[in-house]
Structures are given as C-alpha cells and as structure tokens.
C-alpha cells in the first residue's frame, strides 16, 4: 500500500529499493527477513491492523533469528475514519511479547526521524508505531538523543508521574496543565520505549511519586501500562499504577477525539481519574 503508507514518491525516486508486495503481509515480513540475511536493512511499512496477520512470521522469521528488520507501523492507535477494522489498538501487546524486539513510539515528527535513524544504526528487530494523519509538530523544545530503553522527562514534579506513549503525550501535557491548575505538581514522561521498559527511570521516580499514570492508545491487556504495573508491584509495591488505555472491546468508527472521550481517554477523563484515585484521596 504505497499510497496509504506515504511511499509513492520514494518508490518513484528509488525504484530499485522499493518493493510493493501487495496485500500479502506474511510474505512482506518473510521477504524482509531474507533481505536482512543478505546484509540489507529492510524497512517494512505497514498498517498496525494488517501487521496482525504476520505475527508468526515476525516471531519465527525475524525475532527468533534476531534479524535487523525495521517495522514502520502506520495507523497505530485510534484511526477514526478508516473504520472499526482498522483501529490499531493491539500492536503494543503482540509486539511486546516478542523476544529481541524493541518497540518505540515517537511524540512528534522530529522524534520519528530520530527513531528511524536509531533503528538503522542499531542491531536486531525494531518496531516504531505512529498514528494516522498529519505528523504532530508540537513539543519541539524536547529532543534528547534516542538511547535504547530510555524515556524522556518533559517536566519534573513529584507525587504524580504521567507517562505518555507516543501520540498520547500531547494530551498528557494538557492533563498535567490541568493538574497544576488544581494544585498538583506532576511529572510528565515521554515513554519513547515501550520495550525495553525503562526500569531505571521507574526506580528513580518511585522515591517521590506515589501514583504512576500510564496513557496509551492500546488495549490494556499486554500493553505498556500492564508492564509498568507488573514491575512496580514486584519492586515498588508501595506505589500505585493507574492505566488509561483502550477498553476490552472493539472501537467503532468515528473521529479520534470523540472516540477518546467515548472510551475514557479524553483529557478531562484522565485528569478526573487521577484526582479521584484512592492514592490522592488518602493524602
């Protein structure tokens, strides 16, 4: 799907480096594995919902052999007008279970470029997931180098830590603004790496944060929030984790903003969930 993935111009400029395999996702991944074995660095540009068909090939043909294949995952998260079957709300779950796979999510267009450069330079399989539509141009004042398994602190506070995954970070910034207006001093984190988990940052924040809030456009089961919750329960049981994610059902067609509100991922929904949490009520 060269048009949908934005690769029409690339295909015209570099016809010998562009392969349209049609609607054959399984073949695309195994083809990329073969290219990697031949010494090339293939980039598989594909929709999140379509990549689900190639989970077996990703596991056995790419990850098991730890091949250097880059997955550029378009339409990740809520896609709105594309329809119910195109909602990309499962990729963080099925990607995170794969050994050797690194899973990244950029906050804006500039960071997507950084992550692509990182993916080309590193070894092994890398997945970068980003949303449908025009690239977000905000939060440009923050651009620390991309380092394996390292998140980025946007604002340092105390008591509440809000951890936003990829495209949700801009809304997380609005959530934090609302919390500050209500007298709180939240920390805002750009997750960057869903896998490997930045446990060093979690350990550091656990010292002066009692509530960790994860925000992602992915189903809760197997998502970033569950991985954070499992780690915190094992290593910092005094801290609590609130996960803001997609409900356990299929999301219908609709505009992204209205869908977020409908499933409890709107800015005000998240802020209210934080302020109504048992952790803050006890203080």
Please name every model-derived segment.
Residues 1-124, 134, ...:
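Thiamine diphosphate
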């Amino acid at each position: 799907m060269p048009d949908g993935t934005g690769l029409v111009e690339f295909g015209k400029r570099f016809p010998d480096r562009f392969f349209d395999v049609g609607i054959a996702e399984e073949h695309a991944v195994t083809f990329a594995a073969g290219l990697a074995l031949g010494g090339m660095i293939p980039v598989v540009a594909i929709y999140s919902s379509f990549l689900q068909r190639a989970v077996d090939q990703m596991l056995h043909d790419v990850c098991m052999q730890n091949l250097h294949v880059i997955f550029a995952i378009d339409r990740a998260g809520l896609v709105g007008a594309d329809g119910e079957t195109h909602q990309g709300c499962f990729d963080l779950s099925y990607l995170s279970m794969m050994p050797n796979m690194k899973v990244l999510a950029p906050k804006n267009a500039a960071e997507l470029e950084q992550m692509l450069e990182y993916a080309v330079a590193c070894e092994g399989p890398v997945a970068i997931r980003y949303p449908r539509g025009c690239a977000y141009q905000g939060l440009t004042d923050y651009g620390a180098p991309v380092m394996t398994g390292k998140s980025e602190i946007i604002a340092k506070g105390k008591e509440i830590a809000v951890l936003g995954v990829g495209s949700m970070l801009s809304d997380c910034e609005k959530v934090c603004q609302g919390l500050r207006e209500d007298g709180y001093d939240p920390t805002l984190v750009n997750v960057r790496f869903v896998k490997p988990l930045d446990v060093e940052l979690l350990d550091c924040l656990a010292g002066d944060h009692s509530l960790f809030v994860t925000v992602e456009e992915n189903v809760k089961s197997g998502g970033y929030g569950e991985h954070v919750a499992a780690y915190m329960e094992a290593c910092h049981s005094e801290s609590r984790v609130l996960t803001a994610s997609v409900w356990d059902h299929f999301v219908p067609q609709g505009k992204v903003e209205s869908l977020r509100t409908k499933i409890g991922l709107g800015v005000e929904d998240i802020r209210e969930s934080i302020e109504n949490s048992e952790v803050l009520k006890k203080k």
